[in-house]
Amino acid sequence: MYITDNETKKALLIFTDIFSGPASNSHISRSTLQEKSAKALKEIEEKELKSLVETIFLKPLSSLRFRIAKENPATLVGSGQLEKIAQAIEEEGADLVVFNSAVSPRIQRNLEAALNTCVIDRSEVIIQIFADRAQTREAVLQAELARLEYSMPRLTRRWTSLAQQRGGAKGTRGASRGAGEKKLELDRRRLKTEITKLKKEVERVRLQRSEQRKTRLNGDKKIGAIVGYTNAGKSSLLKKLSGAEVFTEDKLFATLDAETRKVFLQTGEKNIQILLTDTVGFVSNLPHQLIDAFRSTLEEAALADFLIIVCDAAHPAMPECLEVTKKVLDELSCSDKPSIIAINKMDDIFDEAQLLNLKERYPEAVEISVTTGQGLEGLKKKITDIIIFDK
């Protein structure tokens, strides 16, 4: 894994688009609309990677975007594109290169050899953020497991780099390589042992969480899960509805643990008590290592009676963020649960056309602002309706 030190490192950002050829003339108007949409999504994609990179205290430099017919199996991009990356590294003084697309261990080694610069991908950045953000024992275990599983196939990268630094004197290269291979094998065994141990510990925590769930499920209180894209305001909403202290911060992946709090709702003269659980935020192309490691936390959504899907109204790609959330929920087999879409941060929207578009596109959604309290009573009413209807 790439660990930053006290000195701020500068990162060159690389994006690749698979190009399948020009659109036919019979679809010119349609392709024009698609191109406009694609351009907007590319801008959002670049902003998101920049934000992720800044979260691990790297300084993002310029972004290079390449269109490729297909991925080069050796270096992902073509030789001419590789030269442009090398030129940008030299001109901008980049310390490392960050690819937005997934980079295999083999391609990563080849790129580092060709560019003589550290190369990481978006998955590694996200895993590093999770490792930095982990606070509780459960989150630390899960983040460490994801980190080790990601690092395992990349071990040879360390030793290739070390061998290049040593150079190897004439007549000693064979012995040096043999020692390196021996050390590499020892490291692999050690890592496998650590991964096995961590998996057992994570499973133990998972069982404990399962027992806690059983206790909650056996009670008479309905359970809701707050889900959504990272930094949409999920923890702030839980804090506002429950009145309890919940850790909140305006950062990506500020919450990695499933926090559960009591919430009291009023229906007529009767008080209803429910349990609401905050969950880890989603992001597009979340590394599978993290999905596997944090499955016990994500399962809180799968076992809930209903879902509150929180969206950030001010996010330029809110519809795409909502689709990412729905995709993850589908993977967890809970997309058919009763759900409420809560569009948060409405106090940040001042454009009348944007407001109208949100109302037309999501007529069933509740427009809220955790900051001002706007729409929270309406949200509580929706929750109450779900609970009464579900009885």
Curated annotation (Swiss-Prot):
GO cellular component, one term: cytoplasm
Cell compartment(s), UniProt: Cytoplasm
Domain Hflx-type G: 222-391
InterPro entries, per the entry: G_HFLX_dom (IPR030394), GTP-bd (IPR006073), GTP-bd_M (IPR032305), GTPase_HflX (IPR016496), GTPase_HflX_N (IPR025121), GTPase_HflX_N_sf (IPR042108), P-loop_NTPase (IPR027417), Small_GTP-bd (IPR005225)
Region spans: Disordered: 162-181
Binding site for Mg(2+): 235, 255
Domain of life: Bacteria
Pfam families named in the record: GTP-bdg_M, GTP-bdg_N, MMR_HSR1
UniProt keyword terms in alphabetical order: Cytoplasm, GTP-binding, Magnesium, Metal-binding, Nucleotide-binding
Sites where the protein binds GTP: 228-235, 253-257, 278-281, 344-347, 369-371
Keyword Cytoplasm among UniProt keywords: yes
GO terms, molecular function: GTP binding; GTPase activity; metal ion binding; ribosome binding
Cofactor: Mg(2+)
Sequence similarity: Belongs to the TRAFAC class OBG-HflX-like GTPase superfamily. HflX GTPase family.
Record function comment: GTPase that associates with the 50S ribosomal subunit and may have a role during protein synthesis or ribosome biogenesis.
Quaternary structure and interacting proteins, as annotated: Monomer. Associates with the 50S ribosomal subunit.
NCBIfam families per the UniProt record, alphabetical: GTP_HflX, small_GTP
Identification of the protein by name: GTPase HflX
Biological source species: Treponema denticola (strain ATCC 35405 / DSM 14222 / CIP 103919 / JCM 8153 / KCTC 15104)
Gene responsible for this protein: hflX
